[in-house]
Amino acid sequence: MSNSSVPLLEVYVHLRNWNFSWNLILTLFIVVLQYGHYKYSRLLYGLKMSVLWCLWPLVLALSIFDCFVNFNVDWVFFGFSILMSIITLCLWVMYFVNSFRLWRRVKTFWAFNPETNAIISLQVYGHNYYLPVMAAPTGVTLTLLSGVLLVDGHKIATRVQVGQLPKYVIVATPSTTIVCDRVGRSVNETSQTGWAFYVRAKHGDFSGVASQEGVLSEREKLLHLI
């Protein structure tokens, strides 16, 4: 048996001694990944985002350390370590670039969510609400249930009246801003219940912050370039 091989007995002893600990750690890891969504638990969501944000610098540091260890020792692994370092750095830079491009449109911290590729923006009672989504939808549905406003099933605001449903909804992505106009609705003013459906009408380099008016203001029509 070579010196680099690990005896099966040592592996068995390690698993026997640390089985419960690894079971607990992996179970917690699964819970954080599966239920780490902001609509379920803000605590788990915060832990999940912290893990994702820490992985980039950790992986980059490990790749750089591997380059240092394999330099002038194993040129094959040194080459792979250099390649992994470059790939990790490029992915990390791309994340920050896309996050800042999205942030300049909507001015919300959701732009730095690693899981977010688009943000739905709307305004009710003068307050802007944002909903992060994986991709820009082709249509957006607002549902009002006894004054509770939901966007595609996600609770956004309470004590909303049917007359306050916006005439348009904005969907911002890193590369463009999509304006979705209201094309249909069905409301009941007595029970403050109903729905409104919005589809894509135009897109461009607009601000992703919804205005209080029913149409885009002149300020929002200006190019939002850095």
Curated annotation (Swiss-Prot):
- Asked if the record carries the keyword Ribosomal protein, the reply is no
- List UniProt keywords, sorted A-Z: Glycoprotein, Host Golgi apparatus, Host membrane, Membrane, Transmembrane, Transmembrane helix, Viral envelope protein, Viral matrix protein, Virion
- A family per Pfam: CoV_M
Q: Where do the record's region annotations for Interaction with N protein lie?
A: 200-216
On the Intravirion side, which residues? 33-41, 97-226
Top-rank taxon of the source lineage equals Viruses
Glycoprotein is among the record's keywords: yes
- Subcellular localization, per the record? Virion membrane; Host Golgi apparatus membrane
Q: Name one GO molecular function term.
A: structural constituent of virion
Q: Where are the transmembrane segments?
A: 12-32, 42-62, 76-96
- State the membrane topology: Multi-pass membrane protein
User: What GO cellular component term, any one, is given?
Assistant: viral envelope
> What does the record note on quaternary structure?
Homomultimer. Interacts with envelope E protein in the budding compartment of the host cell, which is located between endoplasmic reticulum and the Golgi complex. Forms a complex with HE and S proteins. Interacts with nucleocapsid N protein. This interaction probably participates in RNA packaging into the virus.
From the Swiss-Prot or TrEMBL record, give the protein name. Membrane protein
